[in-house]
Each structure stands twice: as C-alpha cells, then as structure tokens.
Amino acid sequence: MAPSFYHYLPVAMDERWEPKGWSIRRWWLVAAILVVLIGVVLVCLIVYFANAAHSEACKNGLRLQDECRNTTHLLKHQLTRAQDSLLQTEMQANSCNQTVMDLRDSLKKKVSQTQEQQARIKELENKIERLNQELENLRTQKEISTTVQVNSGGSVVVSSLLVLVAVLFLHF
C-alpha cells in the first residue's frame, strides 16, 4: 500500500479517464437512436408523400395540368393565326383604302373633265344655234334677193325687149 501522507485517495486508472456524467457509449447509443428515429421519420414522410403523389387527386391534377398546357399551346397557336389574319386583313384594308382614295381622286378628275366637256358642248351648241340662225337669215336674204332678181330680171328682160323693139322700130 502507498504511504499515507499523499493528499489524494488512490483511484483506479479506468475510472480516472472516464468523464463525469454520461459515458461515450451512452452518447453513441443516443446518437444511434436519434439516427434511427430520423430515418423512421424520413421513411414515413417518403411513404406519405409517395402515396400523396400517386393519389387520384394528384393524378387528376397532373392530367389537368397537361390538358391546360395543351389548351394553352392551342390557344397560343390560334392567337398567332388570328394575329396573322388580322395583320393581313389590316394590310388589305389599307390597300383598299388607298385604292378608294385613288379612285376618288380619279373620279374627281373625271367629273371635272366631264363638266368642262359639258360646258364646251353647251358653248358649241350655242355657237351652232347662232350659226344656224345666221344661215337661216342668209337663206332668207338669198331667197328675197333671188325673188327680187327674178322679178327685176323679168322686168329687165321686158324692158330690154321693149328697147330692142323700139330701136328696131325706129331703125326701120
């Protein structure tokens, strides 16, 4: 035995190195239990979410999501076609509007030309009427002068004959 004058009591070596409170084995046991509990919780959650993912509601949701995606794609395609059709229709409308404007301008020019031609025709008709009147006057004057000449021509002939007869009488 050791001398009695040491100030501490003799302690066995294996007790000396162990920490006070819980031992390392207990810590490992607690850690293992926690890992197993966490694993069980994770497995339960995976099973729960796997069942939820394969449930009818989830399948219906996925099917509806696919239908919505397809419908959205179809609607986008139809919208694109409608926009293209609208653009083409607007271009045709602009072309038609331009054609209408050109035709309106052309019509205004034609109306103006027609009015000018009608005014010219009216002027020429008036001139023709005036010339016809003058022609009628000249015909009337010619008839009068012809009648006068015929009348005066007959008296000239008669007077010429009388003079001739008188000269012949006087001469013989």
From Swiss-Prot:
Superkingdom as given in the UniProt entry: Eukaryota
Expressed in which tissues: Ubiquitously expressed, with highest levels in brain and liver. Present in liver (at protein level).
Membrane topology reported for the UniProt record: Single-pass type II membrane protein; Lipid-anchor; GPI-anchor
UniProt-annotated location(s): Golgi apparatus, trans-Golgi network; Cell membrane; Late endosome; Membrane raft
InterPro entries: BST2 (IPR024886)
GO molecular function: identical protein binding; metalloendopeptidase inhibitor activity; protein homodimerization activity
Record's keyword terms, sorted: Cell membrane, Coiled coil, Cytoplasm, Disulfide bond, Endosome, Glycoprotein, Golgi apparatus, GPI-anchor, Immunity, Innate immunity, Isopeptide bond, Lipoprotein, Membrane, Signal-anchor, Transmembrane, Transmembrane helix, Ubl conjugation
Stretches of the chain found on the membrane's Extracellular side: 48-152
Lipid attachment locations (GPI-anchor amidated serine): 152
Main subcellular location of this protein, as a coarse class: Golgi
Keyword RNA-binding carried by entry: no
Prodomain residues: 153-172
Glycosylation sites: 70, 97
Listed GO CC annotations: apical plasma membrane; cell surface; cytoplasm; Golgi apparatus; membrane raft; multivesicular body; plasma membrane; side of membrane
Record-linked SUPFAM superfamilies: Sec2 N-terminal region (SSF144284)
Pfam families xref list: BST2 (PF16716)
An individual GO BP term: negative regulation of cell growth
Cytoplasmic side of membrane: 1-26
Post-translational note: N-glycosylated. The GPI anchor is essential for its antiviral activity.
Quaternary organization: Parallel homodimer; disulfide-linked. May form homotetramers under reducing conditions. Isoform 1 and isoform 2 form homodimers and also heterodimers with each other. Dimerization is essential for its antiviral activity. Interacts (via cytoplasmic domain) with ARHGAP44. Interacts with MMP14 (via C-terminal cytoplasmic tail). Interacts with LILRA4/ILT7. Interacts with RNF115.
Role of this protein: IFN-induced antiviral host restriction factor which efficiently blocks the release of diverse mammalian enveloped viruses by directly tethering nascent virions to the membranes of infected cells. Acts as a direct physical tether, holding virions to the cell membrane and linking virions to each other. The tethered virions can be internalized by endocytosis and subsequently degraded or they can remain on the cell surface. In either case, their spread as cell-free virions is restricted.
Notes on the domains: The extracellular coiled coil domain forms an extended 170 A long semi-flexible rod-like structure important for virion retention at the cell surface and prevention of virus spreading.
Name of the molecule in the record: Bone marrow stromal antigen 2
Taxonomic lineage of the native organism: Eukaryota, Metazoa, Chordata, Craniata, Vertebrata
Gene giving rise to this polypeptide: Bst2
